[in-house]
Amino acid sequence: MADCGGENVVMEETMRTETDEIRDNLKYLTLLSRDYPSQAAAASDIISTQALLKLPKGTEHFMSDLHGENEAFVHILNSASGVIREKVDQVLGDTVPKHTRAELATLIYYPNEKLPQLKARCTSEEALDQWYTETLLRLIDICRLVSSKHTRDHVRRCLPASCGYILDELLHAHFEDHDKDLYYGQIVGSIIENGRADRFIVRLCELIKHLAVDKLHIVGDLFDRGPRPDIILDLLMRHHNVDIQWGNHDVVWMGAAAGNPICICTVLKTTLAYHNHGMLEDCYGINLRHLQRMAEQFYGNDDLSIWMPHTDAARGPYTRGMLHRCAVMHKAISILMFKLECHVIDRNPDFQMQERDYLRRIDWEKHTVKIGEKEYPLRDTSFPTVDPADPAALHPDEQLVLRKLVQSFRQSEKLQQHVEFLYAKGSVYHIENGNLLYHGAVPMTSRGTFAMERFEGRYYSGRALMDYCDARARRGYYAPEGSAARQSGQDFLWYLWCGKLSPLFGRSAMTTFERLYVEDASTHTEVKDPYYTWYNDEAVCRRILAEFGLPGASHIVNGHVPVREKNGESPIKGGGRLVVIDGGFCRAYHEKTGIAGYTLVYSSRTMSLRTHQPFESAEKAVKDNLDIISQKNILETENHRILVEDTDEGEVLRERVHDLKQLVAAYQLGWITETRCEDHIW
């Protein structure tokens, strides 16, 4: 009897504790009751959520360093780094020839481009109908496989309104008491007969790609020298589930969109150096007319050999006039940029970049520049807008050009949309499902400890430094116009681009001036942060993970630095704790690395690294059914299939179930009045 009494006391205390918690949360639960006005509504969601927890984890796709290379990005996005082809092979196997499976995979990647080619091979109406039937049935089977990780409700929400009901029937029909072939045959036959086959094929292909990857992670550098970063951002804005970790090329564009003059000059210098300014003018509507006029006025007759843009034969041809126009603007904007760098360095002594004000270190009589303790001859000695007595002072014409450029960047509606998206979906780092994602580095000392940096009177290191960088970067865009906080944030966006201890840059200096003006290659060296030595050490990687609250079995996903595979370098560091996935999209790096980079796929069963070969063109990929996956390396295989309940999303869902159970209890206690519905079973 005594034991039973003790159990009753424990039960009463437990009930009191649960009741107290409900009472404490009553204000929140009352708000929650607006969405779930009855016990029936809350209980229904509890049941569906608990079922969702038992589904397999969705596939995550990691990409990095896109560098504006839109065609390669689109191909890897469409193919999900080989996931789509794996699903095609899994469903069709050896029953369908390899070349037919390759064609079907290409159709899924590029339905609008591939469909006309495949139809053109059909020599009769009967042959076309037969091809339609085979293709639709195969696509339905593949779509059923990729939808198996999702609830039926989720799949329905992904279906296009115009044909959603029919696709739902095709994907979820049951055949216990009727003939599957007869049922499918009737629906598919009707689709073909009514001239809707093309539309259904395209919709199925898009649905397969949507369902095959649950989450896309972009680990930085959407912008750089590639031709169309705007296309990449347009696609990402339409993606169903994406996050972004800013790279140094991204933050400088974010600063430019905020109207920061030094960031504007920096992005212009990069685009002009690679003859990509057409994208600025045509896609973002940036007016370069005033810059071109000033450039011709002051530099039109100069020797522009060191200012000629890097060109890509695949994007040519280029006329002499085109190259001259680009080179003269390249020189004008570079000198303006070097002047503005002096201003930013003066305003921010805590950046510790005082040695980078090179215009002040030029001997105007000897035509040399002092770098460190040595003097070097200048490759170009024409500085008509520079006053030797005050080299950083802006010429009146430069001031006018700068005002017009700031106005143009601020008024570019598309650029503002893209940068707002980068802020909304982006951050300096991201943690999800046991993976720590960041673009560049966690700055370290030569001894392998976290580097301590002082900003605005306080010291930061490790995670605190990354959090500080994120917060100050947001000031540059969102702080009130004209405020000191906004100016400080914009200066910091430039620091994140090239600062010696920037976690997004990870090098001692951005040697832009030296590469342009100094012949001696020893001055061009950009010393990597000690992080890039220490990340080979497993203990250091585990310490980084611990700094961010993750257990040692977690992973770091890093971008930024191309892996020179042809020299034997491995993308797997720190005993498998860190993976470098620089996407290698930038064509300039292919000769150095021997490959076109890596992507990462994390499914419910494995984490795998995908190695890519250089991508020629979308046209060739469509025509010849080319893919660029050359190798798949399994990094980890799970002992059991990872379920939604094992993920970060699962934790959120369990909290929702807990809250809904409390709401049901509050209804039962009479503390919240429910709105009863006619049709319920509770």
Name these PLM-found stretches.
Residues A2-W682:
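Feature recognizes metal-dependent phosphohydrolase scaffolds
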